[in-house]
Amino acid sequence: MLVRDLESSLLARFPRRDAEAWDHVGLSVGDPDAKVRGVLCSLDATLDSLHAACSLGCNVLLTHHPVYISAPDSFCPPSAERPSSSAVVYEAVRLGVSVISLHTNLDRSHEARASLPGLLGMEARSSLEYPSDPDATGLGSLCACDPITLGDLAVRLRDSFETAPTVWGDPKMTVSRPTFLGGSLGDFGELAVRAGADVVVTGEVGYHRAQDLSLRGMGVVALGHDRSEQPFCSILADACVSIGVPAEHVYVNPLPMQWWVPTQGDFA
């Protein structure tokens, strides 16, 4: 299988038309005619993930987040004076690693919709973007669950996503209509309100949006952008295997500890 075959098969499964207009998906750097020797699936395209790919014998780095949205002015070795994407592209070329990304087109997939609530044993009824059309691809997951307090839900999320979430709302409030949106909540809190959700689980949310939703009676749980989307790497890996890349040559890059919070004298 060539890199171009892998890219076209992935984009057939997660179409470009489902990506946001501003997004950068597909092959960013690499030789389309190179034979695929192995694929490392990673949330981000970083120097560390490139080197991890090489150490595993992989010449394709398949990521959720694009190496860039807008291309940097130059592609050079690492420097504090240039964006990190400049060095990543430079190093990818030097190492002969192709970088393919599936971003908002993956976010809108049925696989992504099922992924996050599935970690808690919940099923998505529809997307948050198109709540009245369960068959349509769309961002987010609208769910229903047995009544649970916001505090207990937050503990389950902490354990399932291995993170230290930020929670808005009364921990004793009972919720039963959660909605999930990996990454950044943005303006989708209003869609959650209109859809009748009573708690939104996301990666990150601005202070004023979280405060507003909380004051209107909705619980908000922010897991961390990266923690909320790391499960998507398994979707990428499964897609590669189903396309025909041998399972023994497909890997998932563990999420690095990029941020931390102090707790009881330790760092977690």
Feature-to-residue mapping (PLM):
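Hydrophobic structural segments
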Residues: 1-268
